[in-house]
């Protein structure tokens, strides 16, 4: 199954609360932190909401 490597590349400071909350729920805490998540529609929706703050790469595992 595909997985997504998600990296926080821009700080959520100054953005709406729901965007900050989405970053937190993705598991991203500090700038340049990276998490690996399953490629499911729920995660894709969260990424779409904060696409201006994160970098996403598809990986095979």
Curated annotation (Swiss-Prot):
Record-stated family: Belongs to the universal ribosomal protein uL30 family.
Gene giving rise to this polypeptide: rpmD
Keyword Metal-binding: no
GO molecular function: structural constituent of ribosome
UniProt name for this protein: Large ribosomal subunit protein uL30
PROSITE patterns: RIBOSOMAL_L30
HAMAP family: Ribosomal_uL30_B
A Pfam family hit: Ribosomal_L30
GO biological process: translation
Record bears the keyword Cytoplasm: no
Keywords: Ribonucleoprotein, Ribosomal protein
InterPro entries, sorted: Ribo_uL30_ferredoxin-like_sf, Ribosomal_uL30_bac-type, Ribosomal_uL30_CS, Ribosomal_uL30_ferredoxin-like
Subunit structure: Part of the 50S ribosomal subunit.
Superkingdom: Bacteria
GO CC annotation, single: cytosolic large ribosomal subunit
Organism encoding this protein: Thermosipho melanesiensis (strain DSM 12029 / CIP 104789 / BI429)
């Amino acid at each position: 199954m595909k997985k997504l490597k998600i990296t926080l590349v821009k700080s959520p400071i100054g953005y709406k609360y729901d965007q900050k909350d989405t970053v937190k729920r993705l598991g991203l805490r500090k700038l340049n932190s990276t998490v690996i998540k399953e490629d499911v529609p729920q995660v894709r929706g969260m990424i779409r909401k904060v696409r201006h703050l994160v970098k996403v790469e598809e990986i095979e595992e």
